[in-house]
Amino acid sequence: MNPSKVIRENVVKLTDLPNIGKASAEDLLLLGIDNPSQLIGQCPFEMYERLCELTNARHDPCVIDVFMSVTSFMSGEEAKPWWAFTDIRKQRLTEK
């Protein structure tokens, strides 16, 4: 869902989350996440690595940005577009 349309109180399914459409919801389901509350405390980088392992494919690193956006939102931050996390992701990956 477009982050500007997200109403926290109405988030009950994965596609109610900011930046999550059908494909991203399917990725989350592959990770065993079927409820938005299960994102609380998750590491987006670990989620990405698990997704790549489960699908036996390397996904676009922007998937990390999407995961960062939803884990941030579920920890209480405001809904932001996924690209707001790109610079943070790039910085963290260069630190590793």
Give residue spans per PLM region.
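C-terminal extensions
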Residues: M1-P18, K22-K96
